[in-house]
């Protein structure tokens, strides 16, 4: 059965400016796109030799090497972009000796075949301001993938 999947993405002006920018031909949105596509929509056990975890809704498992080979970008470039995405709180990444778990913080929800799936890791813009996670002017941008 083919699913109809839409994404509710909320970004601050600073986050959007970073993702829209490009340096040395690197498309940062492509990297975010790979993470969004890899995110699970229900709890999922994951195991490879020497590593196992339970992925929650809104988490993706992709190593920097995997991202590098999928996008044909240098691994060091992927690492720098992910570091900046973490700094801007677009994602939160945790590395192990085998792979990385990326928690998507910019996705508020998914709509799958008309059913809303909330992201438990999403932090509302209002709460980001109160927590001091983002300073300066913020604007909401909701993108729906059709």
Role assignments for model-derived ranges:
Residues 117-140:
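A contiguous pocket-lining binding segment that forms or flanks enzyme active sites
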Residues 97-116:
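Short, cationic-aromatic polyanion-contact patches
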């Amino acid at each position: 059965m083919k699913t109809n999947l839409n994404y509710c993405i909320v970004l601050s002006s600073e986050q959007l400016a970073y993702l829209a920018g490009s340096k040395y031909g690197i498309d940062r949105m492509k990297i975010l796109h790979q993470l969004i596509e890899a995110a699970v929509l229900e709890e999922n056990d994951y195991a490879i030799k020497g590593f196992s975890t339970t992925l929650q809704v809104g988490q993706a498992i992709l190593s920097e090497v995997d991202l590098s080979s999928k996008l044909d970008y240098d691994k060091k470039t992927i690492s720098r972009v992910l570091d900046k995405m973490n700094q801007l709180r677009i994602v939160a990444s945790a590395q192990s000796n085998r792979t990385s778990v990326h928690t998507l913080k910019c996705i508020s929800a998914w709509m799958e075949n008309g059913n809303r799936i909330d992201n438990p890791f999403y932090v509302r813009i209002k709460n980001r301001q109160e927590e001091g996670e983002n300073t300066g002017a913020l604007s909401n941008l909701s993108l729906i993938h059709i």
